[in-house]
Amino acid sequence: TKEDNLLRKFEEIHDYIYANDGLSPQQTLEEFVKILFIKIFDENENLNQFTISTEEWNELKTGKPVNSIIERIAKLFEKTKEAYQDIFDADDRIKISNIALGFTINKLQGISLLNSSQDAKGLAFQKFLSHHEKDGRGQFFTPEPVIDFCVAMMQPKPNETIIDPACGSGGFLMSALKYLQNNNDKLNTKKVVAKNLFGLDINKSIARIAKMKLLLEANGNINILCTNSLEDLDGIKLSLANSEGFDLVLANPPFGAKITNTNTLSKFD
């Protein structure tokens, strides 16, 4: 199936980077997600820059620095960072070797993530994450059955705005979206994702994963911000273009974390 084919490609890329570049499982996942953002940006803008020729790939395999591919992807990443400023910093860079980058592009260039069915690409990415998310951060993730139970208990409606102020990799938001899809035959998924689902997380690399999950479901405006939701709630509402507040809060905050910043604490006295 398309889902299995995509999942196989994702796994091959992850395993290649992990085996050849000496990165931790967490770093490998972070780099792979960066590459997916570059790929989707290239498709969205019809740039056709996310490519590697047979000649370039063969030269890379001999150990030569192939400047054409390195420069092409570097420029593409700069544009990608501009497009997704909420989850990328200007000084973010690709931290995998040229050969691993070439391998990744070679595996992905023949497929279109935007034109793949939502189910195929979404499920492939979800299965891929289920294999790798827990490698470095499993203790922070709420089990899926618990998330689904909480969402079903709240019975979200298509017109309600939902926020997770500690969204992690987007488990509650994805579960809410699935609930809405399963209970509303004519749901406009793209509109719901753009207008009704909001997520905040202080960790940029985890926020990227949440954004990628929703991008693969509905390519468009995705309201995931990397920010500390305890610090400036009014500013956050403005940046989310939602000054009215939210109908539902679905979250499992990191209760184990200790806050010592007096400015933050003063807001809750």
Over which residues does each language-model region extend?
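Long recognition/docking surfaces used for binding and targeting
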Residues: 34-37, 41-130
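Conserved phosphate/pyrophosphate-binding and hydrolysis machinery centered on Walker-type P-loop NTPases
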Residues: 22, 26, 94, 114, ...
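Mobile active-site "lid"/loop adjacent to the S-adenosyl-L-methionine
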Residues: 255-269
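Conserved S-adenosyl-L-methionine
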Residues: 136-251, 256-258
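Generic alpha-helical secondary structure signal
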Residues: 8, 119-124, 145, 171
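Accessory nucleic-acid engagement/destabilization modules that flank
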Residues: 1-47
